[in-house]
Amino acid sequence: MKFIIILFTLISIVTAAQRIYNKDYSYYGCNSYCDKASDQEDACGYYDDDVSYQDYYGCLCGNEIFLSNLKSCDCFTSIIASVSKSVCSKATEDSDWGYYDDSTSSIMDFFTADNTPASNTGMTTQTDGAINDNQNTGSKTSSGAANYLTSFSIGTFFVFVLGLI
């Protein structure tokens, strides 16, 4: 009985750690598109204090290659997000985003850890060639590894419950 409880706990911890690793990895170093998008953010002044908030986003807004790389930087889900409206709205003075602070944030931060857009404000999604404003598609599918880990966790839970009976 104690063995089953320890085994269940160990498997749950490993599964949670793997999910955290996968979600972090999905936008940084996942594929060459992610690396290129990150490099282009750096080139626009992500780490440069002399680059203003609007200049930074203006640089990204006009960079079609950056936007293309960002759209292709998606390894674990099938979400297709067009972030150009968000980036360009941050580049204008009269945007709804305003000046909350003087620091810049990575465009990669538009997504939360679960790969869904962090906010519907200014976010557009693209489906079948049409652009639908302010819709959050969320995560459509996940990788085989994530499905395996989820199934494994559920199976482990059932083994634990059966062990209690």
From Swiss-Prot:
Membrane topology, record value: Lipid-anchor; GPI-anchor
Lipid-anchored residues (GPI-anchor amidated serine): S143
UniProt keyword terms in alphabetical order: Cell wall, Glycoprotein, GPI-anchor, Lipoprotein, Membrane, Secreted, Signal, Virulence
Signal peptide: 1-16
Protein name as catalogued: Probable cell wall protein PGA15
Function: Probable GPI-anchored cell wall protein that may be involved in cell wall organization, hyphal growth, as well as in virulence.
One cellular component (GO) term of this entry: side of membrane
